[in-house]
């Protein structure tokens, strides 16, 4: 039904007065309906038809409204998975020395953060620690904005040692953030918060050597927040992304695209482990890991 104008109405040529068409639709059954509104005109002596496609649907649910609120003081849970192989000593030192750059965004935006650290080794002397949050010399496992001597504690935690061998961030990250480790009071209980964004930050100079395909770990990590809140999880990597290591730096193997897959699937950030400017690299990682939510997921698929 067209309201506001009668059928067969003619618009005077050269008129500058706009004509408004208001269409009303009322379904008579369930399901999709289509139609068209046709405007017949004559331009330059030639008849033309302008067709406006119409779509409608009859359903039982009616209008669905989703409401999203951005936290004024966002929360972020950050798991650092740090390569503890023999070639990582200088990289761990650089990470510790540039803590302020990593935390710059969180500090300036008053982010309520949890930071935990675990290592990559899966099969030798440090394998028992992989997936378990490390404790500092003072017994601190979870760093918070209120943690005393935060810089000292951070430097202590990220110095995970260099006695490891096989290197994987995906496997220990998944172990750390899922049951039974995440609910075990002797391991990682208290780290995850339901209303906080979650970020894994992998720091390694090697391709990921986890035994399963990346999609296996991705699905488990995404399930932590759930399909409707997938935008609350990111996977970020400081790793070996150049064809070969530049002079003065070293890789423990070249990139095999497994890191790239995890980053791209979660809208994470990747930075070069052999960067000449750790401050800038960690600042970019920090902005993404600690940042406000940028993706909001609807509860139902819209009719578009």
What is the role of each PLM region?
Residues 1-64:
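Feature for long, exposed domains in two main contexts
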Residues 55-304:
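Divalent cation-coordinating acidic motifs and surrounding scaffolds
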């Amino acid at each position: 039904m067209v309201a506001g104008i009668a059928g067969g109405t003619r618009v005077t040529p050269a008129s500058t007065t706009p004509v408004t068409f208001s269409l009303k639709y009322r379904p008579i059954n369930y399901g999709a309906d289509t139609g068209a509104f046709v405007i017949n005109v004559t331009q330059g002596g030639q008849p033309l038809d302008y067709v406006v496609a119409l779509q409608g649907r009859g359903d039982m649910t009616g209008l669905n409204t989703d409401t999203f609120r951005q936290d004024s003081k966002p929360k972020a849970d950050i798991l650092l998975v740090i390569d503890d192989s023999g070639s990582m000593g200088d990289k761990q030192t650089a990470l510790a020395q540039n803590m302020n750059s990593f935390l710059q965004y969180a500090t300036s935006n008053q982010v309520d953060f949890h930071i935990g650290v675990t290592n990559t080794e899966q099969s030798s002397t440090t394998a028992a620690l992989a997936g378990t949050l490390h404790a500092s010399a003072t017994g601190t496992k979870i760093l918070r904005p209120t943690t005393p001597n935060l810089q000292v504690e951070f430097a202590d935690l990220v110095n995970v040692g260099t006695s490891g061998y096989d290197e994987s961030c995906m496997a220990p990250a998944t172990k750390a953030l899922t049951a039974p480790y995440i609910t075990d009071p002797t391991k990682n209980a208290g780290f995850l918060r339901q209303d906080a964004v979650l970020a894994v930050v992998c720091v390694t100079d090697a391709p990921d050597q986890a035994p399963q395909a990346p999609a296996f770990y991705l699905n488990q990590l995404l399930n932590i927040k759930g399909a409707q809140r997938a935008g609350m999880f990111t996977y970020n990597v400081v790793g070996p992304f150049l064809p070969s290591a530049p002079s003065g730096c070293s890789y423990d193997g070249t990139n095999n695209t497994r890191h790239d897959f995890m980053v791209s699937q979660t809208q994470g950030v990747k930075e070069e482990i052999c960067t000449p400017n750790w401050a800038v690299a960690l600042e970019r990682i920090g902005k993404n890991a600690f940042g406000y939510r940028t993706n909001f997921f609807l509860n139902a698929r819209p009719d578009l």
